[in-house]
C-alpha cells in the first residue's frame, strides 16, 4: 500500500468514517490528518503480540548463542567448517540468564517479551518508555524503569526495540546512542527498520563495539543491507515478526470489529473504535 498523505486524504468523501487497518504499524498513513478530517484510524493492536514477542525472544537467543553463525556453517555441508565452527561457538557464546535486557518502548508486545525473557531465560528486565508502567505491573514483570534512554543503553547487555516509527523515533538509535552501549553488547529490532540508523549499526558491528545484532525489519525494506547480510554475527529475517496464520486472522477480525463499533447500518457514527490511534486529533476536529 502506498503512502496515505494529506493530499490523498483530502480526496476522501465525507462519508468515510473509519480507516480500519488489518495491521499494527501506521507509519504509512498520516493518522493526524485523518483525525482532522473526522476519520478514525484504528489498527490491529493486540493481534500480533504473541507472534512478535516470540520472534524477539528467538532473536535474543540468537544474538547470545550465535545461532546464525552456526546455521551458516552447517549449511556449507563442509565437515571442516562444521568442526571449526562447533569449537569456536563455545568460546564466544553466552547464556542469556543473568544478563540485562534493555527494553525500549514498553507496550503490549514488549511486556509479553519481558515476561518470557524473565521466566524462560532468566534475564533481568530494565525498560525505558515516555510513559512509565504502574508499580503493580512493574512488580509483576520484575521490570526496572529508567527515565532516560541513555541510562538504559549504558547498562543493557542486549537492547530490544519496540517503538512505533515517527519523526521522534526515526534514527533513534544512531551513532551516539550506539556508542553509549556496553562494548560487546547486542541489539534486536522487531519494531521498524528506520528506528536504527543502518550505517551507524554497520560501523558498530565492524569495529566490534557490538558483538551481534538481529533485525526482523530493515531501513530500506524490502532491500536488506548487503553489509549486514554478509556478517555471520547478524540474524536477519524478512519482517515476519507477526507472520503467523493466527495473527493474520486476528488482524482481519479486529478490523471488522473496529468498523462495526464505529459505523451504523445507515453509515452514521455509532461510537469509537476498539483500538483508536488518532483520538486526540479526531476529538479536536470540528
Where is each model-derived feature located?
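Conserved S-adenosyl-L-methionine
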Residues: 119-124, 207, 211
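Rossmann-like adenosine-cofactor binding region
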Residues: 4-5, 130-227
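An N-terminal-biased, well-structured beta-alpha scaffold segment characteristic
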Residues: 1-42, 174
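Glycine-rich Rossmann-fold phosphate-binding loop(s) that bind the pyrophosphate
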Residues: 106-107
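Gly/Ala-rich phosphate-binding loop of Rossmann-like dinucleotide-binding domains
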Residues: 114, 118, 205-206, 229
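Phosphate-coordination loops involved in phosphoryl transfer and adenosine-cofactor binding
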Residues: 16, 97-100, 175, 184
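Phosphate-binding beta-alpha-beta segment of Rossmann-like dinucleotide-binding domains, i.e.
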Residues: 44-100, 112, 116, 120, ...
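C-terminal helix-to-coil terminal segments
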Residues: 43-54, 69-73, 92, 221-286
Amino acid at each position: 500500500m502506498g503512502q496515505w498523505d494529506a493530499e490523498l486524504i483530502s480526496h476522501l468523501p465525507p462519508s468515510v468514517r473509519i480507516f480500519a487497518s488489518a495491521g499494527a504499524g501506521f507509519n504509512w498513513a498520516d493518522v493526524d490528518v485523518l483525525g482532522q478530517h473526522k476519520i478514525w484510524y484504528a489498527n490491529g493492536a493486540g493481534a500480533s503480540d504473541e507472534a512478535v514477542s516470540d520472534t524477539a525472544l528467538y532473536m535474543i537467543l540468537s544474538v547470545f548463542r550465535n545461532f546464525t553463525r552456526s546455521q551458516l556453517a552447517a549449511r556449507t555441508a563442509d565437515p571442516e567448517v562444521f568442526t571449526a565452527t562447533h569449537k569456536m561457538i563455545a568460546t564466544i557464546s553466552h547464556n542469556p540468564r543473568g544478563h540485562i535486557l534493555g527494553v525500549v518502548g514498553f507496550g503490549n508486545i514488549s511486556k509479553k517479551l519481558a515476561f518470557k525473557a524473565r521466566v524462560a531465560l532468566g534475564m533481568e528486565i530494565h525498560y525505558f518508555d515516555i510513559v512509565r508502567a504502574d508499580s503493580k505491573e512493574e512488580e509483576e514483570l520484575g521490570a526496572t524503569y529508567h527515565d532516560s534512554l541513555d541510562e538504559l543503553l549504558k547498562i543493557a547487555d542486549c537492547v530490544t526495540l519496540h517503538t512505533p516509527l515517527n519523526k521522534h523515533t526515526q534514527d533513534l538509535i544512531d551513532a551516539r546512542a550506539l556508542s553509549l552501549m556496553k562494548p560487546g553488547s547486542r541489539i534486536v529490532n522487531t519494531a521498524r527498520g528506520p528506528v536504527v540508523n543502518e550505517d551507524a549499526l554497520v560501523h558498530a558491528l565492524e569495529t566490534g563495539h557490538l558483538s551481534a545484532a538481529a533485525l526482523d525489519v530493515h531501513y530500506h525494506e524490502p532491500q536488506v543491507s548487503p553489509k549486514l547480510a554478509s556478517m555471520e554475527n547478524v540474524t536477519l529475517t524478512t519482517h515476519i515478526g507477526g507472520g503467523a496464520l493466527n495473527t493474520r486472522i486476528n488482524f482481519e477480525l479486529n478490523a471488522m470489529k473496529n468498523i462495526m463499533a464505529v459505523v451504523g447500518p445507515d453509515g452514521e457514527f455509532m461510537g469509537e473504535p476498539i483500538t483508536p490511534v488518532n483520538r486526540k486529533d479526531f476529538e479536536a476536529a470540528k
